Amino acid sequence: MSRISDAFQKRKSLIAYITVGYPDIETTLRLVPLLEENGVDIIELGIPFSDPLADGVTIQNASYQALQNGVTPEVCLSVAALLKEKISIPMVFMGYYNPIYNYGLTKFCQKCATAGVSGFIIPDLPPGEAQDIDFAAREAGLDIIFLLAPTSTDERIKLVAAKSRGFIYLVSHSGVTGATANLPADLSSFVNRVRKTARQPLAVGFGISTPEQAQNIAKFSDGIIVGSRILQLVQTDPSLEKVATFIRQLRQSLD
């Protein structure tokens, strides 16, 4: 069992996404330990990219600002190495394939392992085209986590169930990331459809923005993923007190 899958064993897993270097590196280094202290089980560290196709306006803007701050994959690895000394929960990189490919797949995976990163998610890389990075990840002892959407075919579900390690990322709705008031009414049937095939923990993301939503989704999933709402609160309250309160509320709703 990996560190990532182990984070689902004792309770519903609360997974938090942040963009590395938004609004600056100093905030990232303060924010991640605060997330752990208030109940987060897994940290997703977003590698900023100039064309984040799967992301809504909040994460797009965060990525743009981080890129303006000079945040590269190398900087993200350095930040992870610093965070490794501050936290005990697993870290996962979330990033698009192009910057990782340009960095070098084997080199990236080896440096992830050295920096204390336990795995990664690449939203624009289909599992059927991931052989090279999957091999490099296995060699480095890393999990590679794939995504499924409500529109995924049974064939795709079987493929992801065979390939994904750590957990499977279930996208709550078609489209892009972003906090939303309403989630699909048939979300539970999608999760249950995947569960018939997959043995990995199932975590739901895209659009979760309230403790009530988190509590409802946790009834039929193994964990929830929150990102855009955290970044919005970071933007409005640099003290991070609102983020801490929000995470505590999410934790309470899951327990």
UniProtKB/Swiss-Prot annotation:
EC category: lyase
PROSITE patterns documented for this protein: TRP_SYNTHASE_ALPHA
InterPro entries: Aldolase_TIM, RibuloseP-bd_barrel, Trp_synthase_alpha_AS, Trp_synthase_suA
Pfam families in the record: Trp_syntA
Keyword Transferase: no
SUPFAM superfamilies cross-referenced by the UniProt entry: Ribulose-phoshate binding barrel
Keyword terms of this UniProt record: Amino-acid biosynthesis, Aromatic amino acid biosynthesis, Lyase, Tryptophan biosynthesis
GO molecular function annotation: tryptophan synthase activity
E.C. number: 4.2.1.20
Catalysed reactions, as listed in the record: (1S,2R)-1-C-(indol-3-yl)glycerol 3-phosphate + L-serine = D-glyceraldehyde 3-phosphate + L-tryptophan + H2O
GO terms under cellular component: cytosol
Pathway: Amino-acid biosynthesis; L-tryptophan biosynthesis; L-tryptophan from chorismate: step 5/5
Residues forming the catalytic site: 44 (proton acceptor), 55 (proton acceptor)
UniProt similarity note: Belongs to the TrpA family.
Function: The alpha subunit is responsible for the aldol cleavage of indoleglycerol phosphate to indole and glyceraldehyde 3-phosphate.
Subunit comment: Tetramer of two alpha and two beta chains.
Name the UniProt record assigns to this protein: Tryptophan synthase alpha chain
Lineage of the species this protein comes from: Bacteria, Bacillati, Chloroflexota, Dehalococcoidia, Dehalococcoidales
